């Protein structure tokens, strides 16, 4: 008698299309599917893969981070490409002239980029301008920037753990005594 093979781990889990039913996103996917197939550029394949991603994997990119990344040597006069949202940052006073391509740009960020003499493209315009992704810099927001990541990692209360505990409130009586001070049991 043969042994049955476990087939539960056979399937490769990855997105082949976006979960969203947004017709405009679907049109972009159609366009970049074509470009990824017909051009030999990795840029189009990466953009296509990112168009499929969930919102948590397409975190917003702040204007300040984009400016910092575009100031690096060799990135002058290049287009910043973000498969996601570009948001404003009030801490930045001077916005340089930028050429940006993004899925969405918040209204304040949009007005500030345009006021500085910059240009904002959509992905279909980018496909016409540089179908192979030449002269572009692909950027993305901080994926681990969400508050929820502070709760992940070594269990809170164990030595050298900086993990944030899920606490009802931040009062004197909550997770402040035992394990936190030597006079109350022990200190981690």
Curated annotation (Swiss-Prot):
Return the Basic residues bias intervals: 161-171, 178-188
Q: Know the name of this protein?
A: Large ribosomal subunit protein eL18
* Gene that this sequence comes from: Rpl18
Q: Which Gene3D superfamilies match?
A: 3.100.10.10
Organism (species): Mus musculus (Mouse)
Q: How does it assemble?
A: Component of the large ribosomal subunit.
**Covalent link location (Glycyl lysine isopeptide (Lys-Gly) (interchain with G-Cter in SUMO2)):** 119, 164
InterPro entries named in the record:
Ribosomal_eL18, Ribosomal_eL18/eL18-A/B/_CS, Ribosomal_uL15/eL18, Ribosomal_uL15/eL18_sf
Instruction: Tell me where it resides.
Output: Cytoplasm, Cytosol; Cytoplasm; Rough endoplasmic reticulum
Q: Name one Pfam family in it.
A: Ribosomal_L18
One GO MF annotation is:
structural constituent of ribosome
What family is this protein classified in? Belongs to the eukaryotic ribosomal protein eL18 family.
Residue positions where Phosphoserine is found in the record: 130
Q: Which UniProt keywords apply?
A: Cytoplasm, Endoplasmic reticulum, Isopeptide bond, Phosphoprotein, Ribonucleoprotein, Ribosomal protein, Ubl conjugation
**PANTHER family given for it?**
60S RIBOSOMAL PROTEIN L18 (PTHR10934), LARGE RIBOSOMAL SUBUNIT PROTEIN EL18 (PTHR10934:SF2)
* Function noted in UniProt: Component of the large ribosomal subunit. The ribosome is a large ribonucleoprotein complex responsible for the synthesis of proteins in the cell.
């Amino acid at each position: 008698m043969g042994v049955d093979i476990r087939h539960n781990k056979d399937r490769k889990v990855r997105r082949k299309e976006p979960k969203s039913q947004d017709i405009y996103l679907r049109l972009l996917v159609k366009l970049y599917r074509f470009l990824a197939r017909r051009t030999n550029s990795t840029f189009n394949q990466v953009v296509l893969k990112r168009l499929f991603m969930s919102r948590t994997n397409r975190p917003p990119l702040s204007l300040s981070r984009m400016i910092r990344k575009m100031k690096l040597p060799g990135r002058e006069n290049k287009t910043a490409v973000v498969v996601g949202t570009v948001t404003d940052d009030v801490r930045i006073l001077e916005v340089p002239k930028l050429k940006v391509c993004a899925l969405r740009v918040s209204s304040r960020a949009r007005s500030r980029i345009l006021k500085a003499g910059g240009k904002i493209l959509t992905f279909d315009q980018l496909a016409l301008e540089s179908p192979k992704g030449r002269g572009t810099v692909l950027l993305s927001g901080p994926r681990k920037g969400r508050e929820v990541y502070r709760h992940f990692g070594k269990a809170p209360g164990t030595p050298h753990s900086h993990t944030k505990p899920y606490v009802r409130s931040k009062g004197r009586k909550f997770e402040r005594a035992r394990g936190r001070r030597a006079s109350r049991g022990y200190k981690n």
